[in-house]
Amino acid sequence: MTELKRTPLFDAHNRYGGKLVDFAGWEMSVQFEGLTAEHEAVRNAAGIFDVSHMGEIEVRGKDAEAFVQYLVTNDVAALEDNQIVYTFMCYPDGGIVDDLLVYKFNKEYYYLVVNASNSDKDFAWMNENKGAYDVEIINISDSVSQVAVQGPKAEEIVQELTDTDLSEIPFFYFKNDVVINGANCLISRTGYTGEDGFEIYVDNDKVDALWDKIIEVGKDRGLKPAGLGARDTLRFEATLPLYGHEIDKDISPLEAGLGFFVKLNKENFIGKDALVRQKEEGLKRKVVGFEMKENGIPRQGYEVKVGDKVIGVVTTGYNSPTLKKNIGYALIDAEYAALGTPIDIQVRKKTLKAEVVSKKFYTRSTKK
């Protein structure tokens, strides 16, 4: 059995009572106090997450912009320096290699943040497609830690630890060389919860003290350490996809309803031809939201039916901590994707009624 990897915050997980599980080969806390308490803390106050398992890959060199532009579906050339964009890397058939954030330092330096489970695959994919581009691709994942502070009180908590005016960092922008709790950090106004907040990148040897200090400053404001369980319910409510669920190698960004992040009018990028063809021919499948009409919690892999016909599969399902409803996402045949369409979910041995609804389960205004 392969030994699980640990983040530099592993000791902190134990100190704060984390319940450890195997997540994509990492030993991580699924929860601390409890999923619902952590979820509600982020919605109403703040939570802190260890996301040091995420991958960070630098692209440097005179062709950095052209290379990243070829790799991803969104338009990175349109970014200002210190701006961030959400995007995909796709296979030639339009399936998704990974979803990622691209941080633009300048035209010759981009910083890509990728999923933990895909980090090695993504690094290999980038090198396979490097071709004649004059770039250096550097996987710095093992030398960088990341914590996310999320929630309506995130800014006031982190502001206590830095002289930099955090209110001046707009949504999806970042600042480098920001001193937080005495450590040099990169801080971005980004997150995976649907709330305002920050993701902070720091050297491994500084992250433990930073974690403790944020909790010390935040606890009287309602901040709680939060695990992977709450991270998943929060992203789910906020219509944020998870690789291996709403997106994967067999699902395109268009099928996932994420065409906004695909710029088909830009010059050639990997997967463009397939995505153009898919759009022209019309989608055969779509990821939709649904709400259970009978009592039962849908889970990934459960069949979706209309009558006796299997029309798709559940990608994520929960009893929503915020909405107090059993809701989910499913990848289904496009002809059944209209809002209000009655469907059935096979929950274990029971066939339960559900209805297609908007995927926008939860929206909170974020700082501009």
Curated annotation (Swiss-Prot):
Swiss-Prot/TrEMBL catalytic activity: N(6)-[(R)-S(8)-aminomethyldihydrolipoyl]-L-lysyl-[protein] + (6S)-5,6,7,8-tetrahydrofolate = N(6)-[(R)-dihydrolipoyl]-L-lysyl-[protein] + (6R)-5,10-methylene-5,6,7,8-tetrahydrofolate + NH4(+)
Biological process according to GO: glycine decarboxylation via glycine cleavage system
One family name in Pfam for this protein: GCV_T
Entry EC no(s): 2.1.2.10
GO molecular function, one term: transaminase activity
Record-level GO cellular component terms: cytosol; glycine cleavage complex
The keyword Heme is annotated on this UniProt entry: no
Assigned keywords, A-Z: Aminotransferase, Transferase
Lineage: superkingdom: Bacteria
InterPro entries assigned: GCS_T, GCS_T_bac, GCST_C, GCV_T_N, GcvT/YgfZ/DmdA, GcvT/YgfZ_C, TrmE/GcvT_dom1
Family: Belongs to the GcvT family.
PANTHER family: AMINOMETHYLTRANSFERASE (PTHR43757), AMINOMETHYLTRANSFERASE, MITOCHONDRIAL (PTHR43757:SF2)
Subunit structure: The glycine cleavage system is composed of four proteins: P, T, L and H.
Job description of the protein: The glycine cleavage system catalyzes the degradation of glycine.
Protein name (record): Aminomethyltransferase
Record organism: Alkaliphilus oremlandii (strain OhILAs) (Clostridium oremlandii (strain OhILAs))
